[in-house]
Amino acid sequence: MMNAKALYKKKALRDRRKLRIKSKLLGDALRPRVSVFRSNRYFYAQAIDDVKQSTITHIDGRKMGFKNTQEDAKKLGALFAEELKKAGIERAVYDRNGYLYHGVVAAFAESLRENGIAL
């Protein structure tokens, strides 16, 4: 189990990565930013138009009954790719939100690519 100081440092490092990544990414209506969030139990994603500061579409793994596993992330990626195509989006910018590109974050991105979304 981690103590409070270690948890604080872990979150601070993730926040620094998040700012470093987000400063280089910008999404618009034609190529939105796909931002992901993973909790210990669930996985979420949304497509964001940074120019209008609005969410184009989103997917909620908790409401759909998917857990935070690689298999479920692949299924969510396929469903999210369909939602993006319905909105007329073929290209996107992937924002891993400070998480390492590994595990469910990588599986979700690969699933988007396999289903026709250029990242």
Curated annotation (Swiss-Prot):
Annotated protein name in UniProt: Large ribosomal subunit protein uL18
CDD domains associated with the record: Ribosomal_L18_L5e
GO biological process terms, semicolon-separated: translation
Similarity remark: Belongs to the universal ribosomal protein uL18 family.
Gene3D superfamilies, alphabetized: 3.30.420.100
One of the record's GO cellular component terms: cytosolic large ribosomal subunit
Quaternary state and interactors: Part of the 50S ribosomal subunit; part of the 5S rRNA/L5/L18/L25 subcomplex. Contacts the 5S and 23S rRNAs.
Pfam families: Ribosomal_L18p (PF00861)
Molecular-function annotations in GO: 5S rRNA binding; structural constituent of ribosome
